[in-house]
Amino acid sequence: MKREGVSAFIVPSTDPHAGEYIPERWKARRWISGFTGSAGTAVVTLKEAALWTDSRYFIQAAKQLEGTEFVLMKEKVEGTPTIAEWLGSVLPQESVVAIDGWVNTASEVESMEISLKSHNLQLRTDLDPFAEIWEDRPSVPKGKAFIQGLEYAGE
């Protein structure tokens, strides 16, 4: 991150297709934090790390993050900062926060840009540090695409 001029990296629980069940290759949040729940976002700075998840996973996350550098952030609990608020409090102004733009929708990127900008932070969308640091990262799935029959389509 330091070499790239990045002060923080946000790691969501998504893949390039915004699928509900994501292939192993894109489970970077699980790999970096150890948290295996299906919903959560990890944020890693040069000095600190935190994981946001919802109430379904508070107990699981607390157990799995125990003994790690990650602090559990309980989403939508009074007093818990948003990711942008937290980053605004731990990073110098004008710091660069990065994401892998391939695993975020355009509306997510726009929302992140707005919230980070309100804390005087910049967003970079072209970084995938896991390509370099996750040595045994699973490969891209090689299954063939196929057309679903109309009988499976909604109205």
Which sequence ranges carry the predicted segments?
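N-terminal accessory/capping or targeting/presequence segment of soluble
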Residues: 1-92, 96, 100, 104-155
